[in-house]
């Protein structure tokens, strides 16, 4: 924050412990809640959470529970991505489970449709492919004004100057 950063994004994915173990992303809700609250206290002006549907061992109930928990924290923006299963890539990330552990296309579609419905009910606005924002967020305002931009990371309210990825 002291270096001028004002936006922060957390790669939540899902809060189900079995799903988290399968994707090697252990981060209990209480931890995400704490760092989200700290970011708000420090003064970050835009907080985003990334959620993923179609993860191994994930079902519709998991997706909806994750959305409920995430919405209780009121991040300004949400990305709601579809999981891409590419087990041939090096590393252990997608080799800790079997192909049949990944939800089938019909279930993924249901997770997206029901998840989107819940996000809209909870006050988020659909910006475009897999992005949602609250009304007060600059990305939503840019969407409304017709000045939204897109880069390889998703939508943005301004042209990308510098992007730094950590982790």
Where are these regions (language model features)?
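A C-terminal junction/extension of Radical SAM enzymes
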Residues: 91-167
């Amino acid at each position: 924050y002291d270096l001028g950063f004002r936006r922060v994004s957390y790669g939540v994915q899902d809060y189900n412990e079995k799903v988290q173990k399968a994707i090697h992303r252990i981060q209990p809700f209480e931890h995400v809640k704490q760092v989200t609250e700290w970011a708000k206290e420090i003064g970050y002006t835009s907080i985003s959470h990334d959620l993923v549907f179609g993860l191994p061992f994930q079902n519709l109930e998991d997706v909806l529970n994750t959305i409920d928990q995430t919405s209780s924290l009121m991040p300004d923006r949400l990305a709601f991505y579809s999981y891409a299963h590419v087990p041939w890539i090096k590393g252990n990330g997608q080799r800790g489970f079997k192909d049949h552990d990944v939800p089938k296309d019909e279930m993924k579609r249901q997770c997206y449709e029901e998840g989107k419905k819940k996000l809209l009910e909870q006050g988020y606005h659909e910006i475009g492919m897999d992005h949602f924002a609250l009304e007060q967020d600059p990305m939503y305002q840019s969407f409304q004004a017709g000045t939204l931009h897109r880069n390889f990371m998703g939508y943005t309210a301004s042209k990308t100057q510098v992007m730094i990825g950590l982790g």
